[in-house]
């Protein structure tokens, strides 16, 4: 273990693996302390395996607790030993997709008071004292209300944790990143999936996967290729939400996506990135 500390804020179980799994596995293997803060239990997820369909929120329920177990297995696969739920397990409920009636549930994360949730996260930041914090961009990557709220809460907590006027010992993280999915690379990936989607449905456009990040906004490239299998294993742990086949996976919509072990980020706060010849910074702690 070294003195590097990385804290990631994600909305639901499985988000951590899909977009940052290789990064987490790499830094964990290199001895960094990884703290994963998950904001909800993912109660509104659609269930893929027919034998587990009864867990869905519109049937018997129980999906949230089941996904806690999946998250534990995924973290074990990635080598992550410090996973927490914001405000405690079950404090905030999955809000569902934007526009769903569940957006109005009084306990859902979308309805949470941002200052209150940020205070809870700031307390974790002050305890862990990470040099680097990672979350979503202001659109939450693809517009999910819980992802957007995670961004808002993290931005507020980043400031609160460093504020000496608030009770407790302040902590200023050196860097804050948003997860990025470069548009050009998504286009190339979609073309490969259109040519060979495996057992899944081929995407018709980039938007079937995510809007993508404008390429000029992407600052950082983390090569986790050596940890591709760990990411795949973690994806397989999230079996209610993710189907895995070879180098591909699909969510409940059945659309083929590649399992990427090279992951990208946009620096939101911190010193100017030390970019290499390819134009990217290659270490979150640089």
From Swiss-Prot:
This protein is called what?
A: 1D-myo-inositol 2-acetamido-2-deoxy-alpha-D-glucopyranoside deacetylase
- Keywords linked to the UniProt accession: Hydrolase, Metal-binding, Zinc
Fetch the NCBIfam families from UniProt.
mycothiol_MshB
Q: How is the cofactor bound?
A: Binds 1 zinc ion per subunit.
Q: Give the family this protein belongs to, as stated in its UniProt record.
A: Belongs to the MshB deacetylase family.
Principal EC category: hydrolase
Enumerate the cofactors the protein uses.
Zn(2+)
Please write the reaction equations for the catalytic activity of this protein.
1D-myo-inositol 2-acetamido-2-deoxy-alpha-D-glucopyranoside + H2O = 1D-myo-inositol 2-amino-2-deoxy-alpha-D-glucopyranoside + acetate
What is this protein's function per UniProt?
Catalyzes the deacetylation of 1D-myo-inositol 2-acetamido-2-deoxy-alpha-D-glucopyranoside (GlcNAc-Ins) in the mycothiol biosynthesis pathway.
Q: What is its EC number?
A: 3.5.1.103
Q: What Gene Ontology molecular-function terms does this entry list?
A: N-acetylglucosaminylinositol deacetylase activity; zinc ion binding
List residues binding Zn(2+): 12, 15, 147
A Pfam family annotated for this chain is PIG-L
Q: Which GO terms describe its biological process?
A: mycothiol biosynthetic process
């Amino acid at each position: 273990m070294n003195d590097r500390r990385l804290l990631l804020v994600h909305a639901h179980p499985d988000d951590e693996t899909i977009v940052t799994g290789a990064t987490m596995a790499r830094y964990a293997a290199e001895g960094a302390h990884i703290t994963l803060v998950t904001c909800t239990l993912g109660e509104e997820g659609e269930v893929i395996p027919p034998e587990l369909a009864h867990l869905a929120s519109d049937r018997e329920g129980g999906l949230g607790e089941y996904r806690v177990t999946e998250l534990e297995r995924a973290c074990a696969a990635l080598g992550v030993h410090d996973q927490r739920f914001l405000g405690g397990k079950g404090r905030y409920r999955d809000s569902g997709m934007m526009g769903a009636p569940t957006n109005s549930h009084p306990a859902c994360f979308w309805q949470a008071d941002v200052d209150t949730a940020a205070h809870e996260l700031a307390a974790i930041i002050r305890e862990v004292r990470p040099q680097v914090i990672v979350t979503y961009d202001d659109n939450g990557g693809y517009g999910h209300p819980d992802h957007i709220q995670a961004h808002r809460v993290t931005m507020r907590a980043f400031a609160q944790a460093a504020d000496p006027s608030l009770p407790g010992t302040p902590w200023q993280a050196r860097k804050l990143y948003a997860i990025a999915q470069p548009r050009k690379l998504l286009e190339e990936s979609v073309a490969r999936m259109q040519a060979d989607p495996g057992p899944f449905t081929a995407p018709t456009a980039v938007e079937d996967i995510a809007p993508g990040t404008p390429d000029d906004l992407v600052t950082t490239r983390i090569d986790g290729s050596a940890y591709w299998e760990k990411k795949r294993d973690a994806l397989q742990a999230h079996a209610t939400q993710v189907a895995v086949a070879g180098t591909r996976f699909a969510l409940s919509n059945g659309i083929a996506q590649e399992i990427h072990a090279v992951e990208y980020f946009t620096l939101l706060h911190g010193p100017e990135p030390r970019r290499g010849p390819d134009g990217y910074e290659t270490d979150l702690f640089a």
